[in-house]
Amino acid sequence: MKVDLVTANWRKSSHSSNNGCVEVARSGDQVAVRDSKDPSGPVLQFTAHEWRAFLAGVRDGEFDSP
């Protein structure tokens, strides 16, 4: 099941400014991510497991530039 994009509760970090942020919505075992500057644009959807693995990689520095 995918996130219902019409009724989704989109959230963004309180640390972000008004220009250029990602928004995240969760529904059950699904997580959706979109660009806040283009809310009607493409949306990436992940399982909760995939999203947790991505966040762990960010925290662990897996995606940092050398």
Which stretches of residues belong to each language-model region?
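Positively charged, low-complexity terminal tracts
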Residues: 1-66
